């Protein structure tokens, strides 16, 4: 359960980071 939740958080974090880089690039 924790691993699945962590993977989900990492995916969301990656997407948010990519969006932020795109917005500020």
From Swiss-Prot:
GO terms for cellular component: extracellular region; membrane; other organism cell membrane. GO terms for biological process: defense response to bacterium. Expressed by the venom gland. Signal peptide: none annotated. The keyword Secreted applies. Keywords: Antibiotic, Antimicrobial, Membrane, Secreted, Target cell membrane, Target membrane, Toxin. It comes from the Eukaryota. It is found in: Secreted; Target cell membrane. The keyword Membrane applies. Membrane-perturbating peptide with multiple activities. It is insecticidal, since it induces reversible paralysis in insects (L.cuprina) after 1 hour, but fails to kill them. It shows moderate antibacterial activity against some Gram-positive and Gram-negative bacteria. It is also antiparasitic, since it moderately inhibits the larval development of the major pathogenic nematode of ruminants (H.contortus, IC(50)=23.2 uM), but fails to reduce the motility of adult males of the other nematode B.malayi. Belongs to the ponericin-L family. This is M-poneritoxin-Nc2a. The lineage of its organism: Eukaryota, Metazoa, Ecdysozoa, Arthropoda, Hexapoda.
